[in-house]
Amino acid sequence: MPTAPRPFLIGVAGGTCSGKTTVSERLAELTGDEHLALIKLDSYYVTRDHQPIAERALANYDHPDAFDWELLNDHLAALAAGASVPVPVYDYVHHTRSGDVKMVQPARIVVVEGILVLYEPRLRDRFDLKVYIDTDADLRFIRRLQRD
């Protein structure tokens, strides 16, 4: 029995409110949702259960150390091998993982989107296509004010 081909991996990076999610969701629409798995880097913020909530709120979530790169790399390897992965669900109110997971199924195309997805070398080297969304800083600021 032939094995499924390795998925095409796309990394979509850019500043906060640059349009990463919009581009990624549009890709899903164009390819058909059943052919694309979307993973958000925000799901891989390190857990901060050991810290008081006031301390968690002060953490720099735009720093590379804020992410669990090892887990994300493991999940991409599993998806490439045809396995489903339990992606953590991040709780923005409590600044830590919720304890829930969202099962992501293997797909022909896997998109990983987030501010620093092109930062980590092992992750960056996995991508078949790397996209950087360059949006004017003033526009991103306005979008962030509207969103948050």
Model-derived segments and spans:
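Phosphate-binding P-loop
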Residues: 2-7
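P-loop (Walker A) phosphate-binding loop of NTP-binding proteins
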Residues: 15
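Conserved lysine of the Walker
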Residues: 20
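Post-Walker A alpha-helix
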Residues: 23-24
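Short, structured coil segments at secondary-structure junctions
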Residues: 32-34, 126-127
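Conserved nucleotide-sensing/catalytic segment adjacent to the nucleotide-binding pocket
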Residues: 34-40, 46-94
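ATP-dependent NMP and nucleoside kinases share a basic, alpha-helical "lid"
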Residues: 98-148
